[in-house]
């Protein structure tokens, strides 16, 4: 079944002889939907086309989820199958079942080249329980579906940080590897965090302060980055930690988001990595939606909301980014929804595409990249969300670890 080829610590499509085989493919097609059930953004659906094209000689059974219980968009996979049919150029059959007789009958009757979409896996209550791969392998879903398929491929990087049934359970009982989305995410993020050309710069912003500080600590401690440049709310937290009076309104916002406790963590990182963390020299205040440039030494208790990095900081940061070989961006530099305060974000994006290898970590900055029409100028744009952040922060992802374990099993089997 296997064609020995990979030098990585996980298997990919290229390691399998997939002709005529039945492939269970876990994808991530979780998409925003309107109240009528129409998909508003099909990016994640389109992202799996390359994987499916490479599996055309096989029978492909898709496992996916949409939203989660209690949400208004927690619905069936029927609209996803419809859109996927259009993009794939052939029928993707929606099956209103997960592992019952109806689903198994469809799988057993498939011919080479067929693609079916099983029902939302989160309709099954055990799916979202966080358990070990061995425990997940002992569930009804795995026991019922596994005998009908030959190979499991995980292409759902965005849920790789979850130890959910459909993410880790099948790797225990089936030959398992990564689909093209998963493969590209792991190779690209690994290069950004570990093997990128130097100098390597991380530019972190947005409103999720704890995530940015986790990533900062990991990449500076591990040597994955030479420098980290801070923007957005995390920069405000770091400025406060460094002794700058950022103003009551800005401190109140930090407190309202539950990030006051992150000031001490930022202080510790600044003390440990003083010369490797870049902070803004100036900022842009929002005066009734008008941009007002202020040096940080001029900030005081009455200062207006900080909505962007200042012009001097933009020049400093973009010069440093342009002279780097590897650049990883995560989170916008300011309130980019307001045109006057999108300047820092846009200039950083334009500078990043001039580096040899550039990564967008996802989130709101991806929206700004699309707004500028520069998606294809980046080496990689992650669709991982929380999984991407955890990976950049050095966390082990259950979905990835289960693929590594499957690879070890394969290596051990070779020795027998």
Swiss-Prot record:
Write down what this protein is called: Phosphoglycerate kinase 2
Cellular component, GO annotation? cytosol
* Phylogenetic lineage: Archaea, Methanobacteriati, Methanobacteriota, Stenosarchaea group, Methanomicrobia
Tell me yes or no: is Disulfide bond among this UniProt entry's keywords. Answer: no
| Gene designation per UniProt | pgk2
What Enzyme Commission number(s) appear in the record?
2.7.2.3
- Example GO molecular function: phosphoglycerate kinase activity
Q: What is its main location?
A: cytoplasm
Query: Which residues are noted in the entry as substrate-binding?
Result: 28-30, 44, 65-68, 122, 162
């Amino acid at each position: 079944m296997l064609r020995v080829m990979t030098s990585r610590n996980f298997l990919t499509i290229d390691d399998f002889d997939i002709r005529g085989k039945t492939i269970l493919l876990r994808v991530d097609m979780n998409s925003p939907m309107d109240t009528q059930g129409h998909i508003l953004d099909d990016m994640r659906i389109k992202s799996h086309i390359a994987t499916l094209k490479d599996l055309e000689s096989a029978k492909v059974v898709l496992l996916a989820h949409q939203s989660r219980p209690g949400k208004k968009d927690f619905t069936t996979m029927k609209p996803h199958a419809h859109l996927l049919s259009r993009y794939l150029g052939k029928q993707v059959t929606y099956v209103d079942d997960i592992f019952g007789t109806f689903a198994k009958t469809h799988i057993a009757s498939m011919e080479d080249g067929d693609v079916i979409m099983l029902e939302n896996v989160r309709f099954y209550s055990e799916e979202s329980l966080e358990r070990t791969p061995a425990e997940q392998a002992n569930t009804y879903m795995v026991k019922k579906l596994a005998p009908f398929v030959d190979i499991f491929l995980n292409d759902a990087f965005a849920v790789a940080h979850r130890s959910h049934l459909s993410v880790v359970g099948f790797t225990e009982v089936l030959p398992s590897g990564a689909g093209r989305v998963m493969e590209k995410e792991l190779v690209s993020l690994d290069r950004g965090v570990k093997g990128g050309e130097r100098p390597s710069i991380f530019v972190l912003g947005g409103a999720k302060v704890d995530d940015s500080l986790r990533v900062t600590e990991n990449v500076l401690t591990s040597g994955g980055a030479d420098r980290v440049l801070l923007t957005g709310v995390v920069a405000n937290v770091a400025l406060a930690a460094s002794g700058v009076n950022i103003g009551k309104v800005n401190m109140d916002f930090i407190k309202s988001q539950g990030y006051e406790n992150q000031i001490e963590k930022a202080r510790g990182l600044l003390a440990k990595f003083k010369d490797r963390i870049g902070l803004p020299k100036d900022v842009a205040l929002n005066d009734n939606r008008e941009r007002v440039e202020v040096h940080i030494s001029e900030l005081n208790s009455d200062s207006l909301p900080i909505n962007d990095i200042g012009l001097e900081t933009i020049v400093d940061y973009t010069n440093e980014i342009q002279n780097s070989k590897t650049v990883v961006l995560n989170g916008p530099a300011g309130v980019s929804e307001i045109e006057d305060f999108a300047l820092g974000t846009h200039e950083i994006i334009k500078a990043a595409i001039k580096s040899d290898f550039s990564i967008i970590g996802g989130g709101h900055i991806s929206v700004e990249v699309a707004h500028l029409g520069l998606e294809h100028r980046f080496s990689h744009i992650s669709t991982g969300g929380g999984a991407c952040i955890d990976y950049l922060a050095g966390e082990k992802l259950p979905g990835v670890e289960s693929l590594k374990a499957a690879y070890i099993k394969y290596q051990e089997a070779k020795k027998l």
